Amino acid sequence: MSAKKTAIESLMGERGHLRTSHEMLKAALEIESRDDSFVPFYIATANYMEAGMGRLDAQDVRMLSRLAEKLGNMSNDEEEIIAEVHRRLDGNRDHLKKFLTCRDALVADETDQKNIANFESVSNAYIDYIHNSMGHHAPSTDIAIKLFDDNDWNDIADIDPEYFSGEQKLYVTQLAVRPDSVPLGKEAAEYVAEYRRDREE
């Protein structure tokens, strides 16, 4: 992408990569002819999502804190909008903890069929939660876009070259062990391009 990304576009790109990661996992779990060769992909995906979801959580907490500061004396509706996102984040942390526990069991024994079945079951539940509770545009984001300036978005995005370097390595590892039958998702740049098009309409 030729133009330099803004902080909010960096956020969109990060979340696009994360979405691609869990959508590839969803696609893998829908393949009937799965076998033990999928396990390295499961582990690599969990490693990527551990980093990505941890960062998403920290960014969203900063955004909600800044939003509360900007709003000041909030209405009941505004308080509920922020509280609802906190509830989603709490649920995401609970699912992520279970997901990573299953990942750790797989790392300890990649051939144990019970470990594989548990990981797949917990992964399906987690992906359902992400799609139903984390994947749609929240009213808090609309308010933030109206109230925040570039400095706010820079603080929230916390653009960190060291993190991006590590994230890229995790993503490359995930792709390297992706079974051929699992389709590739979109690149982060495609999500940023979509965001730019939406802003122009």
What are these regions (language model features)?
Residues 1-54, 59-201:
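Small-residue-biased structural context
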